[in-house]
């Protein structure tokens, strides 16, 4: 009788764990849109291939604006080919843009994991610097959603001139708790704990938050903002998690953040302050 009861408890816990594992897996593993081939996004002249330290080929786009140009490294969200953010590089001819798909995303080889994504990002920044020819005048890092987790870890190690985060979170595990309360903290290791890395970041940080974001809700962004040694500039966009890119003010705001790390002067009216 006791064995039967214990078995039922174990099975119940396993059933509860399934949606938690599913949510965390969804946060980093590619889906339909990430599986889209790079050719769908065009701009063949800028298509590029970088080799990771283990030989895995990472593919995407490298907009090399020439020796001494600032370098912007862009990290996208889950279920997203980085080609979806090419408009940013096309709107800015003054900076070099490194926009590579994560392992297993787009045309990139391999299987993603948190440690591999961060290691790949740092290695490819070093290679991009070499290809530019001489040190870039500055390094700027942009991260969206899961890419904000990558961006925070890279920024803590690389000391960029600016860090721009779009729909960022405190940790994936904490976000998962919104969907399955408590269990992620009890049953899974924490992943992409951005609040652990934020205290090491000394460059200006700009955060663009979506007002109608139901995936990364405001408390998770607020918890991250509190972890930085200097309060970031925070702006709220009238969009949801997946539609921030389509706002006419999105690209101007990101480009503005690269100039100074925080905003001054007039802002698009749709972007409210803190």
Describe every region a protein language model picked out.
Residues 53, 57-128, 149:
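Membrane-embedded segments
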Residues 239-250:
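Catalytic histidine-centered segment of alpha/beta-hydrolase-like enzymes
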Residues 211-216, 241-243:
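Acidic catalytic loop of the alpha/beta-hydrolase fold
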Residues 143-147, 151:
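Gly/Ala-rich beta-loop-alpha elbow adjacent to hydrolase catalytic centers
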Residues 5-50:
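An N-terminal hydrophobic leader/cap segment in hydrolases
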Residues 164-174, 239:
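Active-site nucleophile loop of the alpha/beta-hydrolase fold
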Residues 201-202, 207-213:
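Short beta-strand/loop motif that positions the catalytic acidic residue
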Residues 194, 203, 217-226:
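Short alpha-helix in the alpha/beta-hydrolase fold that links the catalytic acid
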């Amino acid at each position: 009788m006791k064995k039967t009861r214990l078995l039922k408890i174990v099975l119940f816990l396993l059933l509860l764990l399934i949606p938690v594992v599913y949510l965390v897996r969804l946060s980093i593993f590619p889906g339909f849109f990430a599986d889209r081939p790079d050719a769908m996004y065009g701009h063949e002249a800028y298509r590029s291939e970088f080799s990771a330290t283990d030989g895995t080929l990472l593919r995407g786009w490298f907009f090399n604006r020439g020796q001494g140009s600032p370098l912007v490294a862009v990290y996208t969200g889950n279920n997203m080919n980085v080609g979806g953010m090419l408009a940013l590089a096309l709107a800015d001819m003054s900076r070099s843009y490194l926009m590579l798909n994560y392992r297993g995303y787009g045309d990139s080889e391999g299987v993603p994991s948190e440690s591999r994504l961060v290691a790949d990002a740092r290695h490819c920044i070093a290679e991009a610097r070499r290809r530019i020819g001489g040190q870039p005048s500055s390094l700027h890092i942009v991260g969206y959603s899961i890419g904000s987790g990558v961006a925070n870890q890279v920024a803590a190690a690389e000391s960029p001139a600016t860090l721009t985060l779009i729909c960022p979170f405190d940790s994936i595990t904490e976000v998962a708790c919104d969907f399955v309360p408590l269990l992620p903290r009890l049953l899974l290791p924490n992943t992409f704990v951005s609040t652990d890395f934020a205290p090491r970041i000394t460059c200006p940080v700009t955060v663009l938050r979506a007002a109608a974001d139901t995936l990364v809700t405001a408390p998770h962004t607020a918890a991250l903002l509190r972890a930085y040694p200097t309060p970031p500039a925070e702006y709220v966009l009238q969009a949801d998690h997946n539609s921030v890119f389509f706002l006419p003010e999105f690209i101007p705001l990101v480009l503005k953040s690269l100039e100074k790390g925080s905003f001054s002067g007039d802002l698009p009216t749709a972007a409210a302050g803190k």
